[in-house]
Amino acid sequence: MKSAMTSSPLRVAIIGAGQVADKVHASYYCTRNDLELVAVCDSRLSQAQALAEKYGNASVWDDPQAMLLAVKPDVVSVCSPNRFHYEHTLMALEAGCHVMCEKPPAMTPEQAREMCDTARKLGKVLAYDFHHRFALDTQQLREQVTNGVLGEIYVTTARALRRCGVPGWGVFTNKELQGGGPLIDIGIHMLDAAMYVLGFPAVKSVNAHSFQKIGTQKSCGQFGEWDPATYSVEDSLFGTIEFHNGGILWLETSFALNIREQSIMNVSFCGDKAGATLFPAHIYTDNNGELMTLMQREIADDNRHLRSMEAFINHVQGKPVMIADAEQGYIIQQLVAALYQSAETGTRVEL
């Protein structure tokens, strides 16, 4: 699955030259002497040119297939709009590249399954940038859960909520290109973090409700302006995931919701021995009525993007490190699809 260490730098290409390609992928790659950013591709050639110039002398392309054939990179970051993750990831894998793909993995579970199977068949690393699981908080809490400190966890609550945060840039309000709204954009992050800490328990069923009450009525928020006439994603979604072990995960996510807080991105866990919150990581319990804190981080770790990218490259180089792998990406894609299906049909979805 992994390439051997070599003396020459790994050649890296980026498909999709938007904000995340700049702030996360290119900025990280250019900090390492064992990596060389050799190509940037975007259908908007001027966008690719700007990113390439910012980080050196990478060649610029508007056709990913032509770029892959000509440049022959070792590693590709897929940062294109969600609709193209499947196409661009398969293209890169079949060109012999290891791939770091932005979330979500794809638009459907079937696509995510094919991406996973293709990577396995070709012996290439496919990872997804579910970076919240790489926070020190998440890593420490996962260790404590594995060691049984919380006991049997029977209720988990994952919240990715914005009060007035519809993105006014990109394609975030376009369901055809994005696949959905807050669930597939920010809710998916807390869903992955929760599932990771829980150890990816087997899912029995999913039940959800979604709402579109604000985005089609307003046109401006704290994250910019949008056109309410073309707003086609949900404002908010609420769902319950039931596990075969008897536990449940309650998920809340929104771009726009009339709550007091401007933003909430957190997960809480209730076990029969102790409870915990994730950001920052706290574990708490009681001893015959005496409230006790068993673990407490004062400030949540902010280097999670860096740790995610670092883990991917180290894994490609053959180091035994954890990544958000293709199989887990498929499971998360299944859950997202089931939540949307349940919300759209008004019925429980069995998995």
From Swiss-Prot:
Catalytic activities: a D-glucoside + NAD(+) = a 3-dehydro-D-glucoside + NADH + H(+)
E.C. code: 1.1.1.-
Listed InterPro entries: Gfo/Idh/MocA-like_OxRdtase_C, Gfo/Idh/MocA-like_OxRdtase_N, Gfo/Idh/MocA_Oxidoreductase, NAD(P)-bd_dom_sf
Entry keyword NAD: yes
GO molecular function: nucleotide binding; oxidoreductase activity, acting on the CH-OH group of donors, NAD or NADP as acceptor
Disulfide bonds: none
UniProt key word Endoplasmic reticulum: no
Keywords: Carbohydrate metabolism, NAD, Oxidoreductase
EC primary class: oxidoreductase
PANTHER family in the record: D-GLUCOSIDE 3-DEHYDROGENASE, UDP-N-ACETYL-2-AMINO-2-DEOXY-D-GLUCURONATE OXIDASE
Family: Belongs to the Gfo/Idh/MocA family.
Role: Catalyzes the NADH-dependent reduction of the oxo group at C3 of 3-dehydro-D-glucosides leading to D-glucosides. Probably functions in a metabolic pathway that transforms D-gulosides to D-glucosides. Can use 3-dehydro-D-glucose, methyl alpha-3-dehydro-D-glucoside and methyl beta-3-dehydro-D-glucoside as substrates in vitro. However, the actual specific physiological substrates for this metabolic pathway are unknown. To a lesser extent, is also able to catalyze the reverse reactions, i.e.
Protein name, as recorded: D-glucoside 3-dehydrogenase
The organism of origin for this protein: Escherichia coli (strain K12)
